[in-house]
Amino acid sequence: MGDCFDAQDIATGKYLNGINEAIEYYFGIEPYKTYKDYFNIYTIVGMSPDSGMGTVNTIREAKFGSQYGLQASGSVGVDENICFEYACEAPTVTENSICETPIVLVENTYEYDGITYMWGDGSAIALCPMSQDIYPYDYRG
């Protein structure tokens, strides 16, 4: 899934290009490269009203609630309930299996601040910014 992508980002292909790049990077490293065929990969589109990620000083509306600095830690925050709800739109994901489904949320920003939120039942949401850098400075490194 991606967040902070508006209608224009989706129409021009920026959204899908960002998602495909993230999938390529993720499965370009071991052990995921070897075991890629064992994964079901789905893209869920959630259109945001605004393009780009907001900050404490520049609030932008995002479908999944992504914002910089609104958490107590100062890190990127997200609305996990909406993320889980949308992830359940994938053909093989249910409320019962969401704890076995890693969710990667590609953020429409080039600011580095990736973080993963994990819960005791095994549920996880990884927030990954887009990358303009080459390896090993991109988000593979």
Question: Model regions: which residues?
Answer:
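Propeptide-to-catalytic entry region of secreted or membrane-anchored zinc metalloproteases
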Residues: 1-99, 106-109
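Intrinsic-disorder/low-complexity loop/linker signature
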Residues: 13, 114-115
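Compositionally biased, low-complexity repeat tracts
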Residues: 61, 65, 116-118, 137
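Nuclease catalytic cores that cleave nucleic-acid phosphodiester bonds
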Residues: 104, 111-114, 121, 126
